[in-house]
Curated annotation (Swiss-Prot):
Source superkingdom: Bacteria
Family, similarity comment: Belongs to the methyltransferase superfamily. PrmA family.
Record-level GO BP terms: methylation
Chain's role: Methylates ribosomal protein L11.
Gene3D superfamilies with a match to the protein in the record: Vaccinia Virus protein VP39
Alphabetically ordered keywords of this record: Cytoplasm, Methyltransferase, S-adenosyl-L-methionine, Transferase
Catalytic reactions on record: L-lysyl-[protein] + 3 S-adenosyl-L-methionine = N(6),N(6),N(6)-trimethyl-L-lysyl-[protein] + 3 S-adenosyl-L-homocysteine + 3 H(+)
UniProt xrefs under InterPro entries: Ribosomal_L11_MeTrfase_PrmA, Ribosomal_PrmA_MeTrfase, SAM-dependent_MTases_sf
Natural source organism: Stenotrophomonas maltophilia (strain K279a)
NCBIfam families assigned: prmA
Protein name: Ribosomal protein L11 methyltransferase
Enzyme Commission identifier(s): 2.1.1.-
Keyword Cytoplasm: yes
Length: 306
């Protein structure tokens, strides 16, 4: 089925009005993207709080209409619905259904991290390398709201877990994924040989997503999720926290207490330039602190002092 697609730019402040107008005149679907994606001004949106829908400062908004829609009539209807909005920047084009679906799916290709960790969307066949007997494959849905491996903060943690497995430090261990989101890191740890994973997140939606992904990946028996108040008080040989730098600072004492003596921690969600203060903060409890960079993002790792 073909469609008529309208694409325009808007701001976070005006987005609700644009979307409301588009839906009123019959848009079948509306998609929002970062207008600065793949540029130095790209904004990372990490996991939202409960009831929040964070957006970028500037967005590209795409709306689909039936193919037989008249572009001029649509534009007139939009201008009549909300004449204060600028509709002049909008552009129309005809798209085929398979083009739209292909463009969407092409954004989410199988991704390899380290020597044998793979994140593969459910709608893709396993690449040949991911079919190896020792491949650690996590399957996720495209566009997952809580982390799919495409962001450098997640990639940094996945590569760290993969290296732990290479070094023989993950096999049979218990792992804490603090701020688990989709559960991607905990699931990767399980696929790499960890015995059990605990996911903690302050968003109930994230816990639902993690539990669902664990079940779909056949790991529901070894994956346990908790809100912070319900988290069992325990120590772990492996702890990973992919949250924000401000949260890593505020939770430093708690996270340090979760790492067993001689255990390892990875901290991510840190912008380049923020790592200095965190290195000093965590030096109270950790040795061998190291910072690793991926683009604008940093990962800090360390070994818990006895």
């Amino acid at each position: 089925m073909p469609f008529l697609e309208l694409t325009l730019r808007c701001t976070e402040a005006t987005q609700p009005r644009y979307e409301n107008a588009l839906e009123d005149v019959g848009a079948l679907a509306v998609t929002l993207l970062d207008a600065e994606a793949d540029t130095s001004n790209e904004q990372a949106i990490l996991e939202p709080g409960v009831g929040e829908t964070p957006l970028w400062d500037t967005l590209v908004l795409s709306a689909l209409f039936p193919a037989d829609s008249n572009a001029l009539l649509l534009l007139a209807a939009l201008e009549a619905f909300d004449p204060e909005l600028d509709w002049s920047s909008g552009s129309f084009r005809a798209v085929e259904d398979e083009d739209w679906e292909r463009a969407w799916l092409d954004q989410f290709q199988p991704m390899a991290f380290g020597s044998r960790t793979w994140i593969v969307p459910w709608n893709h066949e396993l690449p040949e390398a991911a079919q190896a007997a020792d491949a650690a494959v996590v399957r996720l849905d495209p566009g997952l709201a809580f982390g799919s491996g495409t962001h450098p903060t997640t990639a940094l943690c996945l590569r760290w877990l993969d290296q732990l497995a290479v070094d023989g430090l993950l096999q049979g261990q218990r792992v804490l994924d603090f701020g688990c989101g989709s559960g991607i890191l905990a699931l990767a740890a399980l696929k790499l040989g960890a015995a059990e994973a605990i996911g903690v997140d302050n968003d109930p939606q994230a816990l639902v997503a993690t539990a669902d992904n664990a079940e779909r990946n056949g790991e529901q028996a070894r994956m346990h999720v908790y809100l912070p108040p319900d988290e069992p008080v325990a120590t772990y040989p492996i702890v990973v926290a992919n949250i924000l730098a401000s949260a890593l600072d505020a939770l430093a004492e708690l996270l340090a207490a979760r790492v067993a003596a001689g255990g390892r921690i990875a901290l991510s969600g840190i912008l380049h330039g923020q790592e200095g203060e965190l290195l000093q903060r965590y030096a109270e409890w950790f040795d061998d602190l190291q910072a690793t960079q991926d683009g604008d993002w940093m990962r800090i790792t360390g070994v818990r002092r006895a």
